[in-house]
């Protein structure tokens, strides 16, 4: 996601730092034909989310499910491809519609 939930101020600040660094670095290296982008996953089935109450959290997600690592990997692969060679400084949310 783009920010943490209530009680996660430190997590939100870290995310904001990554977003700012992504945009600044993208401008710094663009003339060298280097792209810099970030991916902001929402709730994804991983070890990090395995202990969460998925039933409760799914009700918050407009697509009513957790994402998969493969869905995130597909975006990363696209951003690393020639098809994304004119995309830089962007943060792509992979979140099922839940903007947190």
Question: What does each model-identified segment do?
Answer:
Residues 2-8, 30-31:
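Active-site "substrate specificity/gating" loop of NAD(P)-dependent dehydrogenases
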Residues 9, 17:
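NAD(P)H cofactor-binding loop motif with strongest signal on the N-terminal glycine-rich segment
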Residues 27-31, 85:
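Alpha-helical segment proximal to the catalytic Tyr-Lys
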Residues 66-99:
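C-terminal substrate-recognition "lid" of short-chain dehydrogenase/reductases
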